[in-house]
């Protein structure tokens, strides 16, 4: 019998509570300034303004070491990259445009480094696209509810619950390092084991890792940063 075997190793790393650094301040200020502008000024004539916005920004950096039969076949380390997301609701907490309660969002490209002007501009573009989508979704929802009214029990349930303002900034306890020599030695040692198993015709060992930072800010006063790491 022949087998295809792939081994992937994961070691989770945790984070701790800390204060904002300079990069955090740039990112959060760009998010909050554009979010406030959108809440106050984003409106088409005769249409609703957004009452709630949520911006997220994720920065990520990753690597992969792959080997087979005692040798390293590939090593890859990516530069930092970033992507943002815009969520928006029109109406109010009792009745908004969220159709099917899926919390739809629009993706927004972000710069590799923390650049206030670029981050703010890209959230502006994402907010504009999300506003137009939200108007369409709200019209669809209103038309559906007109044809299918809520029951008395359903009518008292709000579309969205307002949460208390909170600020939580987490930083990792230790620096995230990629020891290429050590990782390649591990891959070589583990992948060499399969030389003795002739019935395994295609084997590989991979060690992958990712360092990620997730930022979130909402008009409800929620400010969050969370590091996500494995290697």
What are these regions (language model features)?
Residues 1-5:
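Positively charged n-region of N-terminal signal peptides that target proteins for export
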Residues 6-16:
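Bacterial N-terminal signal peptides
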Residues 18-231:
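Active-site bordering "gate/hinge" segments
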């Amino acid at each position: 019998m022949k087998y295809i075997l792939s081994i992937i190793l994961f070691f989770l790393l945790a984070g701790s509570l800390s204060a904002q650094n300079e990069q955090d301040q740039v990112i959060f200020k760009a998010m909050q300034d554009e979010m406030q502008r959108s809440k106050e000024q984003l409106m088409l004539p005769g249409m609703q303004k957004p009452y709630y916005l949520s911006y997220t920004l994720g920065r990520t950096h990753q690597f992969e070491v792959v080997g087979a039969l005692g040798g390293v076949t590939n090593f890859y380390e990516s530069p930092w990259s970033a992507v943002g997301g815009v969520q928006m609701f029109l109406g109010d907490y009792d009745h908004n445009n969220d159709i099917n309660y899926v919390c739809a969002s629009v993706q927004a490209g972000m710069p590799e480094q923390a650049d206030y002007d670029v981050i703010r501009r890209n959230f502006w573009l994402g907010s504009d696209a999300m506003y137009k989508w939200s108007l369409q979704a709200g019209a669809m929802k209103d038309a559906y509810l007109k044809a299918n009214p809520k029951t008395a029990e359903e009518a008292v349930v709000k579309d969205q619950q307002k949460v208390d303002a909170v600020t939580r900034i987490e930083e990792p306890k230790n620096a995230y390092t990629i020891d290429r020599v050590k990782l390649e030695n591990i891959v070589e040692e583990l992948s060499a084991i399969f030389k003795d198993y002739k019935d395994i015709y295609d084997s590989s060992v991979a060690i992958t890792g990712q360092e990620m930072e997730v930022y979130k800010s909402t008009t409800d006063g929620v400010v969050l940063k969370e590091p996500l790491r494995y290697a």
